Regions:
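Mg2+-dependent prenyl diphosphate-binding active-site environment of isoprenoid biosynthetic enzymes
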Residues: 8-186
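Single conserved hydrophobic/aromatic residue that forms the stacking wall/gate
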Residues: 1-12, 187-193
Length: 193
C-alpha cells in the first residue's frame, strides 16, 4: 500500500510541477521549454491556464482521496508558496539592481520549495521520523536552489540547440537572475575602483 501511495503522490507532485510550468510559460510569454514548444504556443494562453488550473484542482482531489492530511497540508502550502514566488518575481521584473537576497527568495519560493516538498513527501509516506523528514526537506530545498541557479546560468552559456531557447531570453523577458546580479556587482565594484 505504501508503494501505491508513493506512486500516487509522486504523480500528484509531477502534475503540480507541470501546472506551475504551464502558468509560468503564460506569465513569461515563453514559447519554448527544454527544446519543445510550450502549451501556450501550441494552443493559446487561455487553454494553458485552464489546463494548469485543472491539473492543480485534480491534484488536490487526488490528495483528498489518498487521505494523507500531512501530504495534503504540505503540497497545499507548497502550491501557495510557488504562487507567492511568481508574484514576487513579477514585482521585481526588469529590476536590474535587484538584490541577490531577493533573487534567492524568489527561487526559494518557487523551485526550491517544490524540490523540498518532493523529497519530504517520500519521507512522510514511508513513515520516517521527523528528523529524517526535515533532513530530506533540507536536502530537497538545497537541491532545488542548486538546480535553479545552474538553470539560470544556462541562459547565458548553453547551446541553443540543447537549451531550446535563445541565449539571454530570461534577461530579455525581464527576469533578473544570479548571473546578471553578479555581473552588476562586478561592474559597480570595478567602476568604484
Amino acid at each position: 500500500i505504501v508503494q501505491s501511495l508513493v506512486g500516487s503522490e509522486m504523480c500528484i507532485r509531477d502534475r503540480i510541477h507541470s501546472a506551475t510550468l504551464m502558468h509560468d510559460d503564460v506569465i513569461d510569454e515563453g514559447t519554448v521549454r527544454r527544446g519543445k514548444e510550450t502549451l501556450n504556443k501550441v494552443w493559446d494562453n487561455h487553454s494553458s491556464v485552464l489546463i494548469g488550473d485543472y491539473l492543480l484542482s485534480r491534484c488536490f482531489e487526488m490528495m483528498v482521496e489518498d487521505g494523507n492530511l500531512e501530504v495534503l497540508k504540505l503540497l497545499s502550502s507548497t502550491s501557495s508558496k510557488i504562487a507567492q514566488g511568481e508574484v514576487l518575481q513579477l514585482q521585481h521584473k526588469g529590476e536590474v539592481d535587484m538584490l541577490e537576497e531577493t533573487y534567492l527568495k524568489i527561487i526559494s519560493a518557487k523551485t526550491a520549495e517544490l524540490f523540498a516538498a518532493a523529497t519530504k513527501v517520500g519521507a512522510i509516506l514511508s513513515n520516517a521520523e521527523n528528523k529524517e523528514k526535515d533532513a530530506l526537506e533540507f536536502y530537497g530545498r538545497n537541491l532545488g536552489l542548486t538546480f535553479q541557479i545552474a538553470d539560470d546560468t544556462l541562459d547565458y552559456n548553453a547551446e541553443v540547440k540543447l537549451f531550446g531557447k535563445k541565449i539571454g531570453q530570461d534577461f530579455f523577458e525581464g527576469k533578473i537572475t544570479l548571473p546578471i546580479i553578479l555581473l552588476c556587482l562586478l561592474y559597480t565594484s570595478d567602476a568604484a575602483d
